[in-house]
């Protein structure tokens, strides 16, 4: 049975968006689609973070969702956090159209992303290849511009 989820991204500044998630069945890839506005032109890190806690803005969402205790990487890497979805790219108009298919995240089961926080970051994610310790944790993606809790949708 197909599962769907949605996340409304908001922050302290102009960045906002809505991301839809769909997974046709357990073990199938999750397809993300949506749009984020108010970004600066270029790439921005895009991750699922550990907690669905936004009580202190995006900072209370904790680190990247990483139940297997791996180092940070890109979405196609074997060595990556479950929440590592790479980058979204904004055009000159500040809009990023999101279209991602990922086989590591799931909308059900032990490591479901439901109830966790989606975050869009200030800078490009270096996919763990930045050559410093922070790269292996966060991809040097910088501050959290907007976030929202991933919830079950119809």
UniProtKB/Swiss-Prot annotation:
Name by which UniProt lists this protein: Superoxide dismutase [Cu-Zn]
- Per the record, the domain of life is Eukaryota
Q: Lipid modification S-palmitoyl cysteine sits where? A: 7
The further comment given in this record reads:
A mouse model of ALS overexpressing human SOD1 variant 'Ala-94' exhibits disease onset at 89 days (males) and 99 days (females). There is a marked suppression of DAO expression and activity in the reticulospinal tract of the spinal cord, but not in the kidney or cerebellum; transgenic mice accumulate D-serine, but not D-alanine or D-aspartate, in their spinal cord. Simultaneous presence of the amyotrophic lateral sclerosis-associated human DAO variant 'Trp-188' potentiates the development of disease.
For the modification N6-acetyllysine, which residues carry it? 123, 137
Give this protein's Gene Ontology molecular function annotations. copper ion binding; protein homodimerization activity; protein phosphatase 2B binding; protein-folding chaperone binding; small GTPase binding; superoxide dismutase activity; zinc ion binding
Q: What does this protein do?
A: Destroys radicals which are normally produced within the cells and which are toxic to biological systems.
Disulfide bridge positions per record: 58-147
Q: What happens when the gene is disrupted?
A: 40% reduction in hepatic GPX1 activity.
Q: Which organism is it from?
A: Mus musculus (Mouse)
What this protein needs as a cofactor is: Cu cation; Zn(2+)
